[in-house]
Amino acid sequence: MELSQLTAISPVDGRYAGKSVELRSIFSEYGLLKYRVEVEVRWLQMLSANTKIEEVPAFSDTSNALLDAIVANFSVDDAMRIKDIERTTNHDVKAVEYFLKEQVASNSELSAVNEFIHFACTSEDINNLSHGLMLTEARDTVLLPYCDKLIDALIALAKEYQHIPMMARTHGQPASPSTMGKEMANVAMRLKRQRAQIAKVEILGKINGAVGNYNAHLSAYADVDWHSESEKFVTSLGLSWNPYTTQIEPHDYIAELFDAVARFNTILIDFDRDVWGYIALGHFKQKTIAGEIGSSTMPHKVNPIDFENSEGNLGLANAIFNHLAAKLPISRWQRDLTDSTVLRNLGVGVGYAVIAYQATLKGISKLEVNEQSLLNELDNNWELLAEPIQTVMRRYGIEKPYEKLKELTRGKKVNAEIVAEFIDNLDMPEAAKADLKALTPASYIGDAIRLVDQL
């Protein structure tokens, strides 16, 4: 059976293929081979630039242009050729080396030094840098832009709903009012902080040989400062240098990165669930789309499917991220191979996250606040004013203010008249009474509006 969206085992490449297409060139087998080719080529070019490595003279402009073109024009056909070679070698990185030897065979200058392709490298020197490039591109071109879209969408909601009061709920029960805008601002600021954490994780790389000590490098060129060359090469790729490793770069930074992404996702799950609840309460309506069906048997249904889809896919993403973060920093002695198969799933976690981000954004775009529903709820809960009344009573030295309001309101239905009568009987200045009587559940929102202004 041929692979297609209908026959793919993973929904990332099946049902949701259109939502994850931007990740294919980064996390696919083609993507990994593309980065490996880039690392191998740049390493060869760096060797040629080192005057102490006389056996690899400085390359001519023509030869450097050929090498640059191999990187820039790397194609699916090139990747397929590498896979053909791998069928013989049964070694994926060695297949890249042999592919490059084929590519430079027609250039006498490069073919003369083709044994310096993959010089002194262990496979993990190439792989860790390839994964670093992969994660850098994914973070910079996919993850962070989606983070920004989500944060911007929530800030826009916060501004739009800035003046719309709502009854808050703690423990699921009525609590002091807020505004819908302020509640959106809370989420935006939480996401903003985690976005900054994601952005500042240093993506590390190493190129120091089979056990991290430059053994092979020094055996051939003892007078080369390989520490300096290693740092210069890794940073030239846009990565941060890790000078202390075993055979593998220990992947601690991958755990840091995915832990930060998982926290971002967890906040988004919290948001998805809250909006789901507000829709259930009638506080949000959803714009309907012609032709869409909400239920196979109940024609009236308009379900919060986007937020449900997001929640489910974020859970899958975090399950993968959590495993990667827990597993990858652990490798027996100087290395075992358990990280290899796990690292092939970097894109799976990111894929589920990206699918979820798109679902949340779609859900947000369909939201319409039901202001009347929010106002009705506030008007049905005048007991919310127990808090400001007992607080002002404390100011004026009235005995047992909390207890008196508890007696008036706890477990009871209170209306405007009952609240006004209670205030009239208080021993406090008339101006203070007037201020309290002017309060309504809808106006008792504290500094919620100004807090949105400060976003």
Model region roles, listed by residue range:
Residues 1-34, 62, 85-89, 282-284, ...:
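Glycine-rich cofactor/substrate-binding loops
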Residues 42-47, 99, 103, 138, ...:
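Generic, well-ordered alpha-helical scaffold segments in large soluble proteins
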Residues 123, 218-221, 236, 240-248, ...:
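A structural signal for small-residue-enriched, beta-sheet-centric alpha/beta enzyme cores
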Residues 136-144, 148, 155, 185-188, ...:
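Short amphipathic alpha-helical segments with heptad-repeat character
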Residues 160-164, 197-200, 204, 235, ...:
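Conserved helix-loop functional segments at active or binding sites
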Residues 221-312, 317:
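Acidic, glycine-rich loop-and-beta core segments that form the ion-binding/anion-interacting portion
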